């Protein structure tokens, strides 16, 4: 089972406050474990603009028509001081990995310097921190009914309102997440 480019959808019974009602986009999954970004937990009072100001990134070619008031997500509890940018594919950044035909992840400062300019990727999601699982941990959590999984779509990452992402991700597999039994078992 390889969950790269999949969503992990928290089951209603998942009570961990870090992951309750969360949707995690899996950026890496291999024999050593998994890494992903929560895409529906905005950090209160932190926008892309405030992050750029704090990092003293001021682009000379800033386009005032491009809003930087989008919220920054809490990608997870690991390395919360590090930024991770999901975006539509654009080449030329110094530290990028193509996850799918529609999504890349970049961790280098050069992508931040394009935000708010005509050079920025068409669609972006900025997060601080990430989520990780040790070898076999995610698979165990799935078997314990903590997560549903479904192949990711860029529409949910980039276009769906944040408050609707949990529900909409579950709809991809035909489930109304609000009516699912929290005590699902194994056949």
Swiss-Prot record:
This is UPF0301 protein PMI0339. Belongs to the UPF0301 (AlgH) family. It comes from Proteus mirabilis (strain HI4320). InterPro entries: AlgH-like. It holds the Pfam family DUF179. It comes from the Bacteria. GO terms for cellular component: cytosol.
């Amino acid at each position: 089972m390889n969950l790269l480019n999949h969503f992990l959808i928290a089951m209603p019974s998942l009570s961990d406050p870090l992951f309750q009602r969360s949707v995690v986009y899996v950026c890496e999954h291999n024999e050593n474990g998994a890494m992903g970004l929560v895409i529906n937990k905005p950090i209160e009072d932190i926008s892309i603009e405030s992050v750029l100001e704090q990092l003293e990134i001021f682009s000379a070619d800033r386009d005032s028509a491009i809003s930087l008031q989008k919220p920054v997500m809490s990608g997870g509890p690991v390395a919360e001081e590090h930024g991770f940018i999901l975006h539509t594919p654009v080449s030329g950044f110094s530290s990028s990995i193509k996850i799918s035909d529609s999504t890349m992840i970049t961790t280098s400062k050069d992508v931040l310097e394009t935000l708010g300019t005509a050079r920025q990727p068409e669609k972006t999601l900025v997060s601080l921190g990430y989520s990780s699982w040790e070898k076999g941990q995610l698979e165990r959590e799935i078997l314990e009914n903590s997560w549903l999984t479904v192949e990711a779509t860029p529409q949910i990452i980039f276009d769906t309102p944040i408050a609707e992402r949990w529900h909409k991700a579950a709809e991809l597999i035909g489930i109304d997440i609000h009516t699912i039994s929290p005590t699902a078992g194994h056949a």
